């Protein structure tokens, strides 16, 4: 056999990408976007203070970062008024959603979400064999009552 030997679950997943990045879309179009709002990027770029902080920290980039993100987690916790153990730092929303699904979902378990919500969440649920139930938007918005009703009917936690 050549190539990786995927588990049956991974082999059964569609070859679809839940989020196509703007760079991929730009290459397909053959031109750059004038505005990248879909990627949740600031049209203003980083603040001068952020640029200065990155420049000041550049000489430390030869070291691995603190895997516990101790200073960052403690700073966020202090700002938000929570304990540091209640703060999770990740590589972005895609990774954090993956952690959430791994920590809280068992195979076959009912998961309820809005139809049209963040697609990577659905991708992670499928990847961990959750049973996804979608609820339509009502008047272009989340429908909390319908979400709660679906959760109660499906036994989602």
Range-by-range predicted roles:
Residues 1-63, 154:
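N-terminal "arm"/small-domain region of PLP-dependent enzymes with the aminotransferase-like
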Residues 62-157:
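Conserved core of the PLP fold type I
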């Amino acid at each position: 056999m050549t190539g990786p030997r995927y588990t049956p679950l991974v082999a059964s997943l569609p070859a679809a990408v839940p989020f196509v990045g703007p760079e991929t879309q730009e290459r397909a179009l053959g031109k750059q976007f004038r505005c990248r709002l879909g990627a949740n990027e600031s049209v203003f770029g980083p603040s001068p203070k952020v640029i200065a902080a990155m420049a000041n920290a550049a000489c430390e980039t030869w070291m691995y970062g603190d895997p516990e993100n101790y200073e960052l987690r403690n700073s966020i916790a202090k700002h938000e008024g929570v304990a540091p153990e209640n703060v999770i730092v990740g590589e972005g929303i895609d990774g954090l959603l993956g952690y959430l699904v791994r920590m809280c979902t068992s195979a076959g378990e009912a998961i309820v979400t809005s139809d049209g919500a963040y697609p990577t969440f659905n991708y992670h649920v499928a990847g961990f064999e959750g049973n996804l139930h979608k609820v339509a938007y009502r008047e272009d918005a989340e429908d909390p009552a319908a979400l709660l009703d679906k959760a109660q009917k499906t036994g989602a936690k």
